């Protein structure tokens, strides 16, 4: 494992505003076995492992960050929009299939043994899902359903989804910046359930109240994740139409007033995933990095 230590001078120079949002202990490049190329890693709630798919191969893989042991947990699927249960025992993924030239999406749960269960049968309208503990909220054709994995009473929680380009909460369109000509992407709800972060195509990243009121411009951040209730982290990337030419991770306060660069442009850091203490990211070359926060 290679460590890149960030100097106090570099950290201070990368902060826009009057406060530092996070303190970085180290950035670790994870040594991967020959032939392994990571595509969008998702870090577990306790930060002990990541789940990823490979750039050139199918299936989902789990990597223990301490031992570096890698196991395939599913021969199918990719790492887009993965979610992991709070105890780390179940991974949730969307599965896409085609029939009669139509695309169908189902929701799968994969346990530590690799046993896969279908939570939502293939449908044309699986708009989104959320996970909290052992509870799963799904939005299918704008209908919200709560499921409990342990047989108990399912706990309701807000779930964000995109339908025909519009931002929805619990199946209801809120589209904080309006609907006409708008295309919303990458929605995510704050840990306390009071805010929603999203990307508005051609405009940038915003944070609004959960009812869609008071949208606040955050900046040009894509694929944002919540670091805590007051901070998001996303990627600021550029391309030449075919390949990524620069990409860095930036943490931002939800009022848009403070921003902190966590990596530099040349790092090509993309698609962050965080548990609040560690941030996993990958690069277009298939490298995997972990940012450890103090």
Language model regions located:
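Sequence signature of WD/YWTD-type beta-propeller architectures
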Residues: 20-294
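Bacterial Sec-dependent N-terminal signal peptides
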Residues: 1-21
């Amino acid at each position: 494992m290679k460590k890149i230590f960030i100097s106090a001078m570099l950290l201070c120079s990368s902060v826009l505003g009057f406060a530092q949002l996070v303190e970085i202990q180290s950035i670790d490049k994870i040594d991967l076995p020959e032939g392994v190329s990571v595509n969008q890693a998702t870090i577990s709630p306790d930060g002990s492992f990541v789940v990823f798919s490979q750039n050139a191969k199918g299936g989902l893989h789990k990597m223990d960050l301490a031992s570096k042991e890698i196991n395939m947990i599913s021969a199918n699927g990719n790492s887009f929009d993965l979610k992991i249960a709070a105890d780390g025992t179940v991974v949730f993924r969307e599965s896409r299939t085609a029939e009669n030239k139509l695309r169908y999406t189902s929701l799968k749960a994969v346990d530590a043994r690799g046993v896969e269960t279908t939570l939502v049968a293939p449908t044309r309208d699986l708009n989104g899902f959320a996970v909290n503990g052992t509870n799963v909220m799904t939005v299918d054709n704008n209908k919200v359903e709560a499921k409990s994995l342990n047989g108990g009473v399912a706990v309701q929680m807000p779930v964000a989804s995109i339908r025909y380009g519009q931002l929805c909460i619990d199946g209801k369109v809120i589209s904080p910046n309006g609907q006409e000509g708008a295309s919303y992407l990458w929605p995510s709800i704050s840990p306390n359930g009071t805010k929603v972060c999203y990307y508005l195509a051609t405009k940038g990243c915003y944070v609004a109240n959960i009812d869609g009121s008071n949208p606040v411009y955050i900046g040009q951040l894509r694929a944002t994740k919540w670091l805590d209730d007051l901070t998001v982290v996303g990627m600021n990337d550029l391309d030449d139409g075919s390949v990524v030419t620069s990409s860095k991770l930036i943490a931002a306060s939800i009022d848009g007033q403070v921003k902190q660069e966590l990596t530099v442009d040349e790092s090509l850091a993309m698609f962050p995933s965080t548990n609040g203490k560690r941030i996993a990211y990958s690069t277009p070359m298939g490298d995997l990095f972990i940012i450890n926060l103090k």
